[in-house]
Amino acid sequence: MRFLCLHGYAFSVEVLQQQMEPITAHLPSDWEYEFLEAGMEPTELMLPNLKQVPKPNYSWYNFPYPEDVEEAYERLAAYVESDGPFDGVWGFSQGGSMAALLLLMHQAEHPDTPYPFKMAIFTSAFLPHSFDNGVVSWDLTEKNTLEPTYLPGRIDVSHGKKLDWKKDLHTSIEYDMINAVKDELDFPVDLLLRWRPSDIPEKIPVPSVHVRGLKDHYSFVDESVYELFDPDMARKMTHRGGHNFPRYNEELVHFAELIIDTVVSLY
């Protein structure tokens, strides 16, 4: 098995390798793991404690500006094309979001061709941003409050003012972030919406493993990525930790069993 491994926000290949060592020690020794580093510098506007994070560190993108998300996606897709084939993709946090985006885009653009991966593993992953759901354009009012304007995309032609963009799952995260740093941004700011499981015509038919911590402090790390996939081909577990990999031995063993069972199901 050959896996493409994608790190999270403000991470690096080296850090992801270190965090994966406890789980890969429970997997077959002849499996290969190839790591791709993201291409953008993270910002304190997204992560206030960035100075405390070991350097070097990278992000796939910062705020979900359409051009930045597209650049990250195109870079990843080109790498898979040039350095593949890979048997599986393994994404942590934002890397998991990018892995899900790659599979969703394949489903949308090449539904009748084989997927680029036979299986996918997601650790502490969250929903990716979508190129087809339109954008929310945020601007500052005279009272220094954020005012959203919905610009419809191919999928969400019915949203308009029906949603509370400050509370909706797919914009509340970005709203909270830009509201916290609004004095340091140039407005208006156009941000992509996220995919929803209800957006896709059918669940992704790729065997998958989904792992998240019960103490994850990011509320947007939930069951949503799992719900993108065919439930008959998806396996999931939770562990006692937070936004990280399982650390207790019995949890690592269970995680490894899920991965190995998924690999066995491929043949």
Curated annotation (Swiss-Prot):
Keywords for this entry?
Answer: Hydrolase
Question: Which residues does UniProt mark as catalytic?
Answer: 93 (charge relay system), 183 (charge relay system), 243 (charge relay system)
Listed pathway(s): Mycotoxin biosynthesis
**What is the induction comment?**
Expressed under high amounts of nitrogen via regulation by AREB. Moreover, components of the fungal-specific velvet complex VEL1 and LAE1 act also as positive regulators of expression. Finally, the pH regulator PACC acts as activator of FUB expression after the pH shift to alkaline ambient conditions.
Return the GO cellular component terms, semicolon-separated.
cytoplasm; nucleus
Phenotypic consequence of gene deletion: Impairs the production of fusaric acid.
Function of the molecule: Hydrolase; part of the gene cluster that mediates the biosynthesis of fusaric acid, a mycotoxin with low to moderate toxicity to animals and humans, but with high phytotoxic properties. L-aspartate is suggested as fusaric acid amino acid precursor that is activated and further processed to O-acetyl-L-homoserine by cluster enzymes aspartate kinase FUB3 and homoserine O-acetyltransferase FUB5, as well as enzymes of the primary metabolism.
The protein, known as:
Hydrolase FUB4
